[in-house]
Amino acid sequence: MQIADDEFRQLVERVDIDGHISVWGTYGVTTVRYLNRHAPILSNFRLGDVLPLLDSAAGRIFLTYLSERTTRPILKAEASKSEESKPSAKETAAITQFVRREGYAWIDGQLFHSIRAIAVPIFDSQGELQATISLVSNQASLVQFPNPVLDDLKATGKKISHRLGWSS
């Protein structure tokens, strides 16, 4: 985690955007580090918060790379708590295919109105997903692709993964 934390701090300073590191915990995608560059975008966002699988960029990374057996109970619990319609199986498959193909996930207002986020995976030496790093902003430019912030985030994710022994 120290390797990820050091690189993450440098990234957040370089791009001057809030960010967080998340891992898979007992209840799903759990935030273990959050750095604010400005006034907090999400004033009620706390360490230990559990993020949704479909409505957060970090969640979409975990949904893509963890087994269905692992994620299914969390998806069911999320669906039972929400009155909003969730993506169909086909739409969910399109999300995970995008993440695998492009190497990142993004959201634009799904979790909170006007909040945008992009996230990338962190893999270990065996190619297993260990964490995600995400950048969060209320600026629309964060999710206008391609953009240099996304390029930096992807490069940082790969650098952390390589330092953990992953080889692409």
What are these regions (language model features)?
Residues 31, 107, 119:
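Short hydrophobic/aromatic beta-strand element in the GNAT-like acyltransferase core
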Residues 1-77:
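Amphipathic alpha-helical effector-binding/dimerization core
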Residues 90-97, 102, 113-115, 130-168:
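Juxtadomain coupling helices with adjacent low-complexity linkers
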Residues 13-14, 109-115:
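Short loop/turn motifs at secondary-structure junctions and domain boundaries
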Residues 122-125:
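Sensor-regulatory modules in signal-transduction proteins
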Residues 19, 50, 95, 117-119:
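Short loop/turn microsegments at loop-to-beta-strand junctions
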